[in-house]
């Protein structure tokens, strides 16, 4: 599964929430040759239950077009679509960057829960170093396309953003000066 930075990607805006989930489910599952009209009540109920976990009221709007949803709602839906059938790996490309802080936190918490509950290997690309420390068990930092820092397991525990900045400075010999990174 994968999520893009842009919440408008990853969903079909003219299709309903239910149709988007059905498309993702049919694409990812072993069920082949099944059509939208053949989605069972059991599958619809599964979609409703997964949507309810978002706590955004989408379970009561399953027939609504996705194009009517906010960016945060669409990104949360895209996360469900990417994990409606547990993937071997989940790729997150700045998946909270375009969201307001409250919605970004909600989507990140949902991501953490889904990844942990389903034991999904997850690769998250982010400029938000706090998020990088909160999710996963390994943090890689890059500079000019090169890995300059690789922190795993025990070494990561208790690290702060300030610690990461210091390790980056030691590894590269330069400070990070990007406000977006420093303020994350």
Positions of PLM-derived features:
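Conserved ABC nucleotide-binding domain
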Residues: 50-67
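Conserved beta-strand-loop-alpha-helix hinge in the C-terminal portion
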Residues: 146-172
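Walker B catalytic motif
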Residues: 94-95
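ABC ATPase C-loop
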Residues: 82-83
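H-loop/switch region of ABC-family ATPase nucleotide-binding domains
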Residues: 126-127
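Q-loop/switch helix immediately C-terminal to the Walker
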Residues: 15-30
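Helical segment within the ABC ATPase nucleotide-binding domain
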Residues: 104-117
């Amino acid at each position: 599964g994968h999520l893009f930075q842009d919440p408008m990607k990853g969903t079909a805006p003219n299709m309903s929430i239910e149709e988007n989930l059905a498309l993702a489910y049919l694409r990812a599952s072993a069920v082949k040759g099944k059509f939208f009209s053949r989605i069972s009540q059991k599958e619809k109920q599964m979609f409703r239950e997964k949507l309810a976990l978002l706590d955004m009221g989408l379970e009561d709007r399953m027939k609504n077009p996705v194009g009517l949803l906010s960016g945060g709602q669409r990104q949360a839906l895209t996360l469900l679509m990417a994990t409606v059938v547990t993937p071997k790996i989940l790729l997150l490309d700045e998946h909270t960057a375009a969201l307001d802080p409250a919605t970004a936190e909600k989507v990140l918490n949902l991501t953490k829960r889904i990844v942990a509950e389903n034991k999904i290997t997850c690769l998250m690309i982010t400029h938000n170093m706090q998020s990088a420390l909160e999710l996963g068990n390994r943090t890689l930092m890059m500079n000019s396309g090169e890995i300059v820092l690789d922190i795993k397991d025990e070494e990561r525990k208790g690290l702060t953003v300030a610690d990461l900045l210091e390790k980056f400075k030691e590894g590269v010999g330069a400070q990070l000066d990007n406000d977006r990174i420093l303020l994350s």
